[in-house]
């Protein structure tokens, strides 16, 4: 790798780190919506980076709807209604320890709206291979009841729900599961204790999908999502 290429890669890394730092400040309200960010030189001095790194960081956040650069005016912080919360990096920056509960709350509202419909669609659109795979995952979940492995349960549970979105046959729903994988993982990790979770309701979804019962699949998923997780 040539020196110029190394420098370019280092510059790119610096701009990403700066974009994350600026995003965190914006998310915390330190740079409020409607305010103008400090200029390139001031930000460069503040974070110890070049003006090029600042410009690239601003471009990154502008692409996510967080900033709006304007000549002779400066870079304005945009209101949250303009932010692209479907951006994986923005989700990761938002989902800090302090924000986790709020992010999950917002995520579950979206999940509760989509996943029952995904189950209903899976009952009518899935193929035999997908249904077989879902049954296999259900078997693995059942086996974990007698020999529980927390990390393995999280992996299988995630695979189960991701597969249902795929089985729906709707590309937007499949993308939803892929996009929010990090939130799913952190959420399932948070709610999983030392035992299987709602095994009967997971089975009810599998049974309904297997038999092509659209409404039953929808209702079973709704029951799964609405029943609170009990910890012992």
Locate predicted features.
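Short linear motifs at protein or domain termini
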Residues: 1-113, 120
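A generic short alpha-helical patch detector that favors 3-5-residue windows
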Residues: 10, 14, 106-110, 129, ...
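Alpha-helix boundary/capping and short turn/kink residues
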Residues: 31, 112, 124-131, 147-150, ...
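Residue-level recognition of specific faces of alpha-helices
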Residues: 79, 106, 133, 176-179
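Inter-domain helical "communication" segments and dimerization helices
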Residues: 85-91, 95-101, 129, 150-152, ...
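Hydrophobic, amphipathic alpha-helical faces that serve as interaction scaffolds
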Residues: 86, 92-100, 110-126, 139-143, ...
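C-terminal all-alpha effector/ligand-binding and dimerization domain
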Residues: 135-138, 142, 147, 155-156, ...
């Amino acid at each position: 790798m040539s020196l110029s290429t190394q420098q370019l890669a280092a510059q790119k890394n610096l701009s990403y780190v700066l974009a994350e730092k600026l995003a965190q400040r914006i998310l915390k309200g330190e740079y409020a919506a409607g305010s103008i960010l400090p200029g390139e030189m001031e930000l460069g001095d503040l974070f110890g980076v070049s003006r090029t790194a600042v410009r690239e960081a601003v471009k990154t956040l502008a692409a996510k709807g967080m900033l709006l650069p304007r000549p002779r005016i400066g870079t304005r912080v945009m209101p949250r209604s303009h932010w692209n919360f479907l951006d994986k990096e923005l989700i990761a920056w938002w989902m800090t320890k302090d924000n986790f509960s709020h992010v999950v709350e917002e995520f579950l509202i979206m999940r509760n709206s989509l996943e029952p419909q995904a189950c209903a669609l899976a009952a009518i659109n899935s193929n035999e291979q997908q249904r077989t795979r879902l049954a296999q995952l259900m078997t693995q979940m059942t086996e974990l009841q007698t020999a529980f492995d927390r990390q393995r349960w999280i992996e299988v549970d995630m695979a189960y729900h991701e597969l249902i979105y795929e089985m729906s046959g709707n590309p937007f729903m499949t993308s939803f599961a892929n996009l929010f994988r990090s939130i799913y993982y952190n959420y399932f990790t948070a709610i999983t204790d030392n035992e299987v979770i709602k095994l009967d309701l997971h089975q009810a979804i599998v049974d309904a999908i297997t038999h092509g019962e659209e409404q039953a699949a929808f209702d079973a998923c709704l029951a799964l999502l609405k029943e609170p997780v009990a910890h012992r």
